[in-house]
Structures are given as structure tokens and as C-alpha cells.
Amino acid sequence: MKEKNILFFFSFLINYLDNLSKNFCFRDYISFELNLLAETGYKLDLTKCCVSHVTTDLTYVSPKSARALSYKVGKPYRDKLLILPKFLLAKDSEITLEEKKQALTLTNYFFNRYLFHNNRQVKAREEFIEYITNI
């Protein structure tokens, strides 16, 4: 039942965004995905480094703890970490295509791990990701 709801959700979202493509706000959508993860019990903590507790130069997210890491702390492990897109920290910055992809990789990792339970990604979500990275 849960998988059918997820399939419906992303199918609906594709159709909805098709009508709103001129007004689509990527920042708001990623915020929605992060809030959806939080509401289902998987909140990402992007406010400070989980090791040094600094709030500056946050660059990575640990896939194990879902918490941010500073560049200095994360650099030796960067191949095992997710990238924290800068626009999630700097609210007024322009969002590049690369940052869009980083943000979707970040949320997609946690969707696949916790909501889709490492099953094959929902096809509708794949189509949705392709769509919004081209807006």
C-alpha cells in the first residue's frame, strides 16, 4: 500500500508541475522533500558539523547519521559522503544545475534508504527527477 501511495504521489507531482513549470521553485521543492523526510522520522541535520560542531564551511552529509560535516572533517572521507548543496545554507544564492543534482542525490539517497527500503527506485520518481532538473 505504501508503495502505491508513493507511486501516486510522484505521478501526481509530475502532472502538477507540468502545469506549473513557469512558477516552479526548486528551493521550495527540495525544502518539501526534506520536510517529508523529517515527517517520516528521517530528519537531516544540516545546521552544524556533527563532529566539530562548527556552523561554517559545511560541505558534506554523512549517509549514516544524516548530519552535516565541515569540509575539513569530511575531506578524508569525501568519497563516502554526500555533497551538501550550498543553496541549502545560503538562502539567497542562485541554484546551479550541479546543485540541483546534488540536492536530488541527497534526498534521493534517504528516500531510497528509508522510504523505498532499498527497493528499486520508483519509476515515476526517476521521471520526476529528470523533469525538474530540466526546468
UniProtKB/Swiss-Prot annotation:
GO terms for biological process: DNA recombination; DNA repair. Gene3D superfamilies: Recombination protein O, C-terminal domain. NCBIfam families: reco. This is Uncharacterized protein RP549.
